[in-house]
Amino acid sequence: MRPLLRGVGSGWDGVMSTTPVIDVHQLNLAYGDFHAVKDLSFRVGQGELYALLGTNGAGKTSTLEIIEGHRKATSGTVSVLGHSPSDRGAVRSRMGIMLQESGFSPDLTVRETVGLIGGLSRRVDDVDRVIDVVDLKRKATTRVSQLSGGEKRRLDFATAVYGGPELIFLDEPTTGLDISSRDDLWRAVDRLREDGSTIVLTTHYLEEAQQRADRIGLMHRGTFHREGTVAELTQTLPAVIGFRLPAGSPPPPIPAAAASAGAFTVETFQLQFDLRVLLDWAHQQGLELADLHAGPTSLDDVFRAIGADPA
């Protein structure tokens, strides 16, 4: 892909505006006694990259379908760009959607597809410029059926960002892309954000969410299990220090769970402090901490903890 040829704006400054781009309040979607979405509330600020994550069946897709105007909620309110999602005339042209499976006509060419979807969006852009942005210029006259999986994803992205919409939904945007194409896509997203676009991301690549998202909503059984910045989410679980001590060593100076063969594990919310205490103690005792490893909590750890927590 090539860089987006657009002006540079401010992006998200971490402060929620008076009128958020997305405002969801007490949202419910029920099928009889089953609640696909239950009492869900959250806001997305202008220029923010907000990641909506969760296990399969957590309610992400249903939530996004309601926000995008494709499904009606049982109860609750949703505001998108200051309007109801059902007010398609006020919202549709200002919103771009990259679906996981686009369903483009296989007989249309790349240029025809971008032109058709772009025209339906009622946004203004140059078709060939957008094709060039996603590095499909050489495929402009190629039919969709003849594209590779990665090329189809780039075409999906092109139709979503055509005309620089204010709000962009990216559903698994890097699936099927090689590393270089992933990097190019994220650079393009960065440029869109600099120009003020708001991004809502769903992905199974947790490292992408951890690196890219301003805030994350973790869904479980139809509602939020946790929500916040990566730092806020990871602070809810302890970091881990692991090491081995020689046989006959005195116990370590900090609470640790002992395993076989002199192996110890420390769970801590003050990683740097406890690690320094442990290292100083080992030095004073003349002991070697074998297999020493320490690491902060990752988003993957938080995600895995969802299944361990009671409902």
Question: For each predicted feature, which ranges?
Answer:
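Helix-to-loop junction immediately C-terminal to a conserved catalytic motif
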Residues: 68
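Conserved ABC transporter NBD signature motif
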Residues: 76-86, 91
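Conserved ABC ATPase "signature" region
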Residues: 115, 119, 124-139
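Catalytic Walker B motif of ABC-type/P-loop ATPase nucleotide-binding domains
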Residues: 168-172
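ABC transporter nucleotide-binding domain
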Residues: 184-269
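Short, charged/small-residue-rich alpha-helical element at the C-terminal edge
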Residues: 238-311
